[in-house]
């Protein structure tokens, strides 16, 4: 029996999640939910449905885990608690200062719905945070280094694009 997965949001992250699911034989992508017209969205998994985000509730008994692939600025603070009432959810919320608030909102909604909500499962916070934790346990007097620096920030670019009147934007760290 495979874990039935839904993806909510099919931008760069959603497409990457689909590719990861395809590499795991114990997982099955059953549906992708989008705000766009589903007929305009082409996915790699031929057996999965592409649906409007408004139809997600109709799938609550057909999906074991909904992976939320929206942005941390405006999508996930609303979407994760909303969908945690209906599904076990995973998100990549990365606004560090707001993680306690986001956790409290998701936890309350998930408990109310009898589900599990796992937040901030990304690079940082997420995998990089765990790696730093493990390294600090082994080398308590060590020093942390990160590679944040020059380049395009997807999260910041997403936040700028959501400002009323902005047609498109990219945020560069120089």
Residue ranges and their predicted role:
Residues 3-8, 12-17, 134-174:
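Active-site-lining helix/loop region of Rossmann-like oxidoreductase modules
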Residues 11-13, 96-99, 120-129, 151-153:
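Gly/Ser/Thr-rich loops at beta-strand to alpha-helix junctions
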Residues 23-44:
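NAD(P)-binding Rossmann-fold cofactor-contacting core
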Residues 49-56:
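Short acidic-hydrophobic, aromatic-tinged amphipathic segments that line or gate anion-handling sites
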Residues 56-61, 65, 73-92:
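Rossmann-fold NAD(P) dinucleotide-binding segment
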Residues 91-92, 117-121, 147, 170-171:
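General beta-strand structural signal in soluble alpha/beta enzymes
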Residues 93-117:
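Rossmann-fold NAD(P)-binding glycine/threonine-rich loop
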């Amino acid at each position: 029996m495979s874990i039935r997965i839904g993806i909510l949001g099919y931008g760069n992250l959603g497409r990457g999640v689909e590719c990861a699911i395809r590499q795991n034989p114990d997982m099955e992508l059953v549906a992708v939910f989008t705000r766009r017209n589903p007929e305009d969205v082409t996915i790699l998994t031929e057996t999965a449905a592409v649906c409007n985000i408004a139809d997600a509730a109709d799938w609550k008994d057909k999906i074991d885990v909904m992976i939320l692939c929206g942005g941390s600025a405006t999508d996930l603070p609303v979407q994760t608690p909303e969908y945690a009432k209906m599904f076990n959810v995973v998100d990549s919320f990365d606004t560090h200062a707001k993680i306690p608030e986001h956790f409290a909102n998701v936890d309350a909604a998930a408990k109310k719905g009898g589900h599990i909500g796992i937040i901030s499962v990304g690079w940082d916070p997420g995998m990089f945070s765990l790696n730093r934790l493990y390294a600090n346990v082994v080398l308590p007097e060590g020093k942390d280094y990160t590679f944040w620096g020059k380049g395009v920030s997807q999260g910041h670019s997403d936040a700028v694009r959501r400002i009323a009147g902005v047609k498109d934007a990219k945020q560069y760290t120089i």
